[in-house]
């Protein structure tokens, strides 16, 4: 208790001294002295009334920290300062680009944050002698325009190359259902007038004239088959002056092969060109054998057993007839005599057979030149006939014969 009493007494003496000093020097409050550092000295007066307190508790009031004061002063100064205008951030808007039926297509477009005030500030900072007026067109746009003009001039200077037209596919509106359209793919017909001229030129050939007069029943050369000849001329890709008589018969044979199921109608072309000879029999047998193999997948397997069957049959016949070996030696001679006899009766058989083989080879080459596109739609045939409907060829209709 003695320590606390002495502490309170000392504190009372200090406060008494401070109060007396304030009474003796009243003018110091009005004009406080400055310190040597240049900052004013602040006097702290404690007018607290002393009283008893709990033992062990500091009676001095808690003072505010220096950091809190500085924070408050900074906040006051920041409130006093005028608020600076912040630049508007770029915004995103949606604008209508196209109108599709009852639906709208929106395109995202960024709004430019540049205001007229920014242009004025920029013009005020320019040096004297500089045009402050804003440019109407950007430099990038000018460069792009100049590059476009140069590219157009270069394209005009270069010679245009004439390329052969290629078949294209377009979509045309077939029917309109409410707000929906049904599209149908249609191939563009690339038959040029020069192909019609080549066809008309070949019709003046005497052999082709005789062939058309020979086909009275129109089994090989009706108007649709002749229209397919013009289409094949356009697809083959040859110049019009290169088409000869053989190309006409190749295209006509290929048209009959695509449209007619009768094999005799195609053989009539060979009958007219090379005559009725027996040289086509091996070719027909070969075709018949190929057709049989395509219809029966086991034909190749069964064919491998043919030599064994012939051997067994020969062994059986030899066992039954001991003179079979003697007669067998005469078989090549008989075949040779028979071939010589047939050749004497028709000396043109060997020559005609080679010509037919050459015709088939040329037909295959002509088919490959068209890239295998031998099918022709009825619409294309109608367009071919509509080019010159008064032509005498289109009167060759089978319906008029019956």
UniProtKB/Swiss-Prot annotation:
Residues 16-39 have a biased composition (Polar residues). InterPro entries: Speedy. Residues 1-90 are annotated as: Disordered. This is Speedy protein E21. Residues 76-90 have a biased composition (Acidic residues). The gene is SPDYE21. Disulfide bonds: none annotated. Belongs to the Speedy/Ringo family. GO terms for molecular function: protein kinase binding.
């Amino acid at each position: 208790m003695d320590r606390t009493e002495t502490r309170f007494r000392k504190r009372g003496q200090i406060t008494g001294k401070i109060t007396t000093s304030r009474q003796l020097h009243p003018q110091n409050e009005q004009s406080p002295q400055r310190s040597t550092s240049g900052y004013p000295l602040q006097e702290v007066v404690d007018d607290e009334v002393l009283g008893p307190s709990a033992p062990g508790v500091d009676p001095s009031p808690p003072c505010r920290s220096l950091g809190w004061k500085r924070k408050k002063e900074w906040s006051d100064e920041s409130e006093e300062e005028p608020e600076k205008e912040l630049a508007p951030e770029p915004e995103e808007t949606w604008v209508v680009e196209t109108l599709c039926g009852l639906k709208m297509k929106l395109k995202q477009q960024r709004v430019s944050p540049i205001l007229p005030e920014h242009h004025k500030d920029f013009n005020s900072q320019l040096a004297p002698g500089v045009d402050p007026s804003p440019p109407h067109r950007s430099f990038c746009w000018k460069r792009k325009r100049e590059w476009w003009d140069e590219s157009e001039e270069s394209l005009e200077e270069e010679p245009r190359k004439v390329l052969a037209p290629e078949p294209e596919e377009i979509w045309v509106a077939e029917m309109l259902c409410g707000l929906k359209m049904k599209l149908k793919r249609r191939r563009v017909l690339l038959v040029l007038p020069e192909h019609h001229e080549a066809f008309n030129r070949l019709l003046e050939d005497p052999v082709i004239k005789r062939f058309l007069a020979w086909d009275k029943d129109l089994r090989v050369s009706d108007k649709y088959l002749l229209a397919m000849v013009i289409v094949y001329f356009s697809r083959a890709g040859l110049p019009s002056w290169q088409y000869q008589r053989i190309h006409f018969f190749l295209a006509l044979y290929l048209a009959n092969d695509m449209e007619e199921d009768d094999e005799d109608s195609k053989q009539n072309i060979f009958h007219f060109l090379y005559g009725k000879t027996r040289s086509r029999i091996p070719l027909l047998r070969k075709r018949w054998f190929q057709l049989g193999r395509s219809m029966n997948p086991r034909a190749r397997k069964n064919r491998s057993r043919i030599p064994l069957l012939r051997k067994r049959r020969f062994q059986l016949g030899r066992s039954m007839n001991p003179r079979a070996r003697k007669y067998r030696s005469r078989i090549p001679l008989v075949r040779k005599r028979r071939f010589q006899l047939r050749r004497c009766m028709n000396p043109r058989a060997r020559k005609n057979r080679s010509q037919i083989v050459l015709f088939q080879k040329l037909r295959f080459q002509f088919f490959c030149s068209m890239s295998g596109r031998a099918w022709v739609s009825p619409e294309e045939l109608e367009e071919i006939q509509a080019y010159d409907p008064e032509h005498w060829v289109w009167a060759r209709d089978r319906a008029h014969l019956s």
